[in-house]
From Swiss-Prot:
The gene is surE. A divalent metal cation binds at D8, D9, S40, N92. It is an enzyme of class 3 (hydrolase). Pfam families: SurE. The keyword Protein biosynthesis does not apply. Keywords: Cytoplasm, Hydrolase, Metal-binding, Nucleotide-binding. It is found in: Cytoplasm. One of its GO terms (cellular component) is cytoplasm. InterPro entries: SurE (IPR030048), SurE-like_Pase/nucleotidase (IPR002828), SurE-like_sf (IPR036523). One of its GO terms (molecular function) is nucleotide binding. This is 5'-nucleotidase SurE. It comes from Sinorhizobium fredii (strain NBRC 101917 / NGR234). Belongs to the SurE nucleotidase family. Its cofactor is a divalent metal cation.
């Protein structure tokens, strides 16, 4: 089985090395195509305004000056002689929960794999940003191999990917695996305005304390309770529940 690895933290990210160790417990045919530099928060973006520069790091490791989406496209359509059987994107430094998935380059790597017709899983590791920036990968390294093997054999409809988040706890403190829905988070987002050396303003987006809906059954609730969250996500963003309501309003508004 051929496995393609990508991420959004870049080719030198520790989480990518962790993911490669995980993948090698499943198959010996593992390829890495990852961004040359950090592409966090770029979501499912393509590079269209400049060329894609590819650097071969080793026989099966490639760095691309592009986004995670670019990486999966290049791997599937250029680098590999045949499509992989599985795309793993991660392991991201920090969880990708709730509204995170709309911004996440990690999830986007799995989205693009799904668009290419490949079984795809996004993998992220929660951690507390305030505690010295240290990330413990033990949970992912311990539990991901068996979990991925199981998820590989689950029949999924076309256009569905899986978003896996590991809790921030000791590996032996994990309270199981939960299939979850996407929760709702507020990011406490603010704009930090500063002045450069020439007196011109510039800005940073600053994330504050997160808060949200921690209802049972959601990804954020599961991770908070030290459970591994597995959320199936659909590429089809249509809200079927309001189609008829809108159609009725249009009929009544136009007299149709």
């Amino acid at each position: 089985m051929r496995i393609l690895l990508t991420n959004d933290d870049g080719i030198h990210a520790e989480g990518l090395s962790v993911l490669e160790r995980i993948a090698l417990t499943i198959s010996d045919d593992v390829w890495v195509v990852a961004p040359e530099v950090d592409q966090s928060g770029l979501a499912h973006s393509l590079t269209l305004s400049e060329p894609l520069r590819l650097r071969q790091v080793s026989e099966r490791h490639f760095a691309l000056r592009g986004t995670p989406t670019d990486c999966v496209i290049m791997a599937a359509r250029k680098i590999l002689d045949r499509k992989p059987d599985l795309v793993l994107s991660g392991v991201n430094i920090g969880a990708n929960l709730a509204d995170d998935v709309t911004y996440s380059g990690t999830v986007a790597g799995a989205i693009e794999g799904t668009l290419q017709g490949i079984r795809s899983i996004a993998v992220s590791q929660a951690y507390h940003h305030a505690v010295g920036g240290a990330v413990s990968w033990d949970v992912a390294e311990t539990h991901a191999p068996a979990l991925i093997r199981t998820l590989m054999n689950v029949e999924l409809p076309d256009g569905t990917l899986l978003n896996v988040n590991f809790p921030n706890c000791a590996a032996d403190a994990v309270a199981g695996v939960e299939v979850t829905s996407q929760g709702k988070l507020e990011f406490g987002l603010s704009i930090d305005e500063r002045i450069d050396g020439r007196g011109y303003p510039y800005f940073w987006l600053r994330f504050g304390e997160r808060y949200g809906d921690f209802r049972s059954g959601t990804d954020i609730h599961a991770v908070r309770e030290n459970r591994i969250s597995v959320t199936p996500l659909k590429l089809d963003l249509t809200d079927y529940t309001v189609q008829e309501r809108i159609a009725r309003a249009l009929r009544e508004g136009t007299g149709a």
